[in-house]
Amino acid sequence: MPMTESKKEALAQFHRKNILQAAQTLFAQKSFAGTTMDEIATLSQYSKATIYVYFKSKEEILQHLTYSSMQKLYEHLHKAITENTSFFECFKSLCYELVSYYQREPLYFELSQKTINSDDVSKETPQAVKDTGNAVRMINSDIAFFLQNGIDAGIVHSNLKLLPATFWLWGSITGIIRLAFQKEMYILRAMEMTKIEFLDYNFKLILQGLLKPEIENLYDKTKCTCPAL
C-alpha cells in the first residue's frame, strides 16, 4: 500500500528533527563555524546526501534552530509578562528569563541580538527566517505591553515612546547579561562584584530609568534578586 501524504510528511518531520538535534549538539560543542555537514551526517546517522534532501545548507539548519529557540524564548517571556500582576515582579521575571536563556543557549542568544528588518523580507527569504522575524516581533509586542501596563498603572514615565523604549529595554537587559558572563573575571577584580551582584545592580539601574521619581523607592521592597547561576 502506498504511503499517504500525511505519513510521508510525518516521516520527513522525524528525519528533520533528528538532523536538527544532531546539529544543535555539535553547534553547542564545537560552534557553528567549527561544525561540518559531514559531522552532522555522522552524528545523526544519515548520509550527507540525505541531509541535503531536507536542508540546503548548514546555514539553513541554523535558521531552523534559531527559529525554534526564539519561539521558545517568546513563550517563556510571554508567560513571565502575562502571568505576573506586579510590575516589579514582571520586570524581574523578564530579566531572569533572559539570563536563563543565555545560560541554556548562548549561540542563539547572540543571534537574537541581530535585528531582522521586515523591509528586507522578500519571496526569496527562507521561511525559517520569516518565522524568526515574527517571533521577534511578538517578543517586542509583549515588552511594549509590559511598558504600557506600567504607564497605565502610574509607575512608568507617561511620556515614554513605546517602540524606542522597547528596543532600549531589550538592548539594555541583553547587553548587561552579555557583559556579566563574558567579563566575569574582570568585573570581580575591578569592581569587586560577583556576576550575580553585577546583574542585580544593573537591572535595578535599568528599572530606575523607567520609573517615575516618586515610585523609585518602592522598588527596594521588591528587590531584583538573581537566582542561583
PLM feature spans:
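Basic, helix-initiating cap at the start of DNA-binding domains
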Residues: 1-30, 35-43, 60
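Hydrophobic alpha-helical connector segments
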Residues: 79-107, 162-169
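Short secondary-structure transition hinges
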Residues: 103-142, 163-164
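Amphipathic alpha-helical linker/stalk segments
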Residues: 65-93, 124, 144-152
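C-terminal peripheral helix-coil segments that are non-catalytic and often amphipathic
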Residues: 1-3, 100, 141, 145-153, ...
